[in-house]
Amino acid sequence: MFHLSNHQANEHTDEAMNVGLPAASEQELSPIIQAKQLYNYKTTHHFFVGDESTVELFNALKGIALHNDHEYFGVLELHPDYEAVLSMLKLLIDSVPELPESPGYNAIQWMEDMHPNCWMAWKNATFYLSGAATLISRFQQYLVQKQVSYEQIRMISY
């Protein structure tokens, strides 16, 4: 579903990439380049929503957020076999079980269960929606109903 590797820091690559991200092979640059293009440097809070196909992208976005002293959080719909990946990568993202027949449903339910004070802290974040098109569409509709502006939502389908 996704490729995990052990990145090693390299100061020359960091300078070339212009950010404090780990060195990566040419094949691994895609999520890093994508993350740099998507990242909203104007906001300090970044919220990720997706499935297991988005772990590499969200890991790259995490690196940019931490480099800029920004906050990030999110929720991923995952098959239970992939939950260990989040802790391996030290991603501060919650996971909910995937429902192949209803992508996005469990992530939306997770948001609905969020404490109102927590929502107040994150409602002005930039939201990164990635993964299956149905998940993205459903979650975008949910955010718009919660009065999140379209300008705050960035979508990446796989």
Located regions from the model:
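Extended, composition-driven regions rather than compact fold-specific motifs
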Residues: 1-158
